[in-house]
């Protein structure tokens, strides 16, 4: 979606948008960085017979269809794109299988004890030799349902069995392996989507 014109190059840049294409940065931070969104005349309609996967990468904004690249980057004053990282939205297993967090989050949204959640890929802290990411979930509990003044351990004892029930509906490689209890709100974009890359950065 980007190319570098022969007459104008910039070191480190991925280039400008292709002709008739558009690039924009979703909800940029103080450094102008955010997820790179792409619009082109040849943008795919979606993934074959996989509506959830399609929704995870293509969004209609003001009547235009935009592709969520999963890349984090910024545009300079001349419209050149610089890639600075990945949003790590899709979790890729060592066998090359893709896990879409939105699919798992949809199932978790039906759990009354969970107010809000974010699924992401995380390094296994118990096994540093294992480089494969495990499926982890950050959960904001529904305190109106489970009660207040509970310790994290008590909250875990309530919510983990619910997660195990959700895991039964998933293929084994998509199963949630780690639960994190979150007490503050998620950082969100102007369209009220969770800033995944910002939340993941907090773990580092």
Per-range role (PLM):
Residues 1-5, 18-20, 99:
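Conserved A3 ("GATE") glycine/threonine-rich loop of ANL adenylate-forming enzymes
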Residues 1-11, 50-53:
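Active-site loops of AMP-binding adenylate-forming
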Residues 26, 70-72, 110-141:
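C-terminal boundary motif of the adenylate-forming
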Residues 30-93, 101:
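Conserved ATP-binding/catalytic segment of the ANL
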Residues 43, 80-109, 143-153, 170-176:
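Adenylate-forming
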Residues 80-84, 89-90, 130-133, 196-203:
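AMP-dependent adenylate-forming
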Residues 118-121, 160, 164-204:
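Conserved C-terminal "lid"/linker of ANL adenylate-forming enzymes
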Residues 124-148, 168-181:
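Conserved loop-to-beta-strand segment in the C-terminal subdomain of adenylate-forming
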